[in-house]
Amino acid sequence: MDTRYTHSPKDISHYSTEELRKEFLVEKVFVPNEVSLTYTHNDRMIFGGVTPTTESLEIILNKELGVDYFLERRELGVINIGGPGFIEIDGRKEAMKKQDGYYVGKETRQVIFSSEDAADPAKFYISSAPAHHKYPNVKISIDEIKPMETGEALTLNERKIYQYIHPNICESCQLQMGYTILEPGSSWNTMPCHTHERRMEAYVYFDMEEDTKIFHMMGDPAETKHLVMGNEQAVISPSWSIHSGVGTSNYSFIWAMCGENITYTDMDMVPMDELK
């Protein structure tokens, strides 16, 4: 597991492109037959990819977290963006097709991931945050979620937001997680942009062609920076940073947040004339 530390806005004001990428970008989220995770000290979120091929995979971080088992003091969100697979939670095995999600509560002792076909492996994107209470495990299908339709074709930001781990769907301590799909012809996400001082966030971009790129905007609104990102790459967004992007084509991304509350609308909008 890779560890990333926290920064203030002043810390990054003179960072080079290489330094920004090293601190905030995760270049390889899904590694075949591996659990590939990042631990950020921003609200102590863990995120990354689990890509089982010929063997089942389990997240084991006892030593790294100082616990007896991974979810002893944590909750977990899972969304499959690959081929059909399975998730086994404390002995109960369930199928997970593409776009299926799962909320797994605190004190769940074992979570095992597997694929139906090694040639078309499942790609489980996971996010985990510290938890103080045990809430029920819930399987989440995208078909059961009424999307928020927002943006316009005229402003190139027409998109559907599917809220998986959200009070309307399931209970959680502090983790929120969802899936945003941009319509063909749209390229902007989260613009006009915002920050949320009370929560950090992480994105993973995907459903992109090989030559499609995302210009992910970050940093203090008065001193913005950007990262050029490719398919299935992730980025950390501290609470003080904007997090927006524009692609050379449409794309999808999974967002995950944790922090002081689970109020999705708790955000501080940034007027366009304040961006620099």
Swiss-Prot record:
One MF term in the entry's GO annotations: zinc ion binding
Cofactor remark: Binds 1 zinc ion per subunit.
UniProt binding sites for Zn(2+): H194, H196, E201, H243
InterPro entries in alphabetical order: KduI, KduI/IolB_isomerase, KduI_N, RmlC-like_jellyroll, RmlC_Cupin_sf
EC class (word): isomerase
Protein keywords: Isomerase, Metal-binding, Zinc
Keyword Cell wall biogenesis/degradation among UniProt keywords: no
Superkingdom as given in the UniProt entry: Bacteria
Catalytic activity: 5-dehydro-4-deoxy-D-glucuronate = 3-deoxy-D-glycero-2,5-hexodiulosonate
Gene3D superfamilies: Jelly Rolls (2.60.120.10), pectin degrading enzyme 5-keto 4- deoxyuronate isomerase, domain 1 (2.60.120.520)
EC number: 5.3.1.17
GO biological process terms on file: D-galacturonate catabolic process; D-glucuronate catabolic process; pectin catabolic process
Required co-factors: Zn(2+)
This protein's pathway: Glycan metabolism; pectin degradation; 2-dehydro-3-deoxy-D-gluconate from pectin: step 4/5
Physiological role: Catalyzes the isomerization of 5-dehydro-4-deoxy-D-glucuronate to 3-deoxy-D-glycero-2,5-hexodiulosonate.
UniProt similarity note: Belongs to the KduI family.
Stated name of the protein: 4-deoxy-L-threo-5-hexosulose-uronate ketol-isomerase 2
Gene: kduI2
